[in-house]
Every structure is written in C-alpha cells, then in structure tokens.
Amino acid sequence: MNYRIDIVIDLDDIQQAIYTEGTWHPADNATAWGVNHSNEPIVDRRVREGLDDLLARMSGYIVSQNINFNIDSQNIVLGVELRKRPLLSLARDLKNAMVSALANYTLMTLYGDEDSIYGTAWRLHRARTLLLLSRP
C-alpha cells in the first residue's frame, strides 16, 4: 500500500529564510550588496534553479507537483508517495528542510560557491530532505 502526503511551501517562507540567513553577510563583507526586496526577481530565479535541482533528486517520490509562481498565489505543492506509513511530522519536516535547502542554494549562488558556508548548508539540507523521504 502506498501513502501520499502533500507538501505546501509558500514562497514567502523561502524569501523570509533567505533574508534571515543572509543578513549578516553584507555586514561581514563590505562589497556584498545584500538580499532585499529590490532584487527579488534575481532571488526568485535562484530559488527556481535550486527547486529544479531538488525536484530532480526527489523525482522517484513525487507523484504530482503544482508549482505556482504567479503574483497572486506563489506557492509550491508537491504530492509525495511513500511505500511505508509516514510519521505525522513528515510533511512539516520536509517543508522545513526544503525551505532551508532552497534558501541556502540561493545564497550560495549569490554570495559564494560550493565551498562556502551556504554551499555546505545547501548540501546538508538537500541530504536531509532525501533522508527524510527514504527513512523507514
């Protein structure tokens, strides 16, 4: 028997995580331009790139997806199918891991590279997402 859960991620949650994680960077680096609402289109583009990478890695589990980047309702809804009964907290844990992964991917591409603190955090949360999906 397969079990299905839906993961709903609001893009505002991702942007808030980006702003929160990225606030110290301009203070630490005088040449950094900072992430704010004026450069939101760049941030949205980076989030989409990270989401494409993450979805490719999760493709074996995803049975449906509705990615909506419209102005009125900006959210991501993923239907995930698992072979074993999921824990009650799995949808929330996956959402949190994906939000953190996408925020750090965005910051990695804006401020650093794979070896930066953001690159390390991106890999950590990406792995956490996949482990949450594959755990018994």
Model-derived features with residue positions:
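Elongated alpha-helical scaffolds
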Residues: N96-Y105, T109
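Conserved acidic
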Residues: N39-I42, L94, M98
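Short coil/turn linking the two alpha-helices of tandem helical-hairpin repeats
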Residues: M108, E114-D115
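Conserved short "hinge" loops at termini or chain/domain junctions
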Residues: M1-L87, D113, T120, L124-P136
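Short, mixed-charge amphipathic alpha-helical segments
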Residues: K84-A97
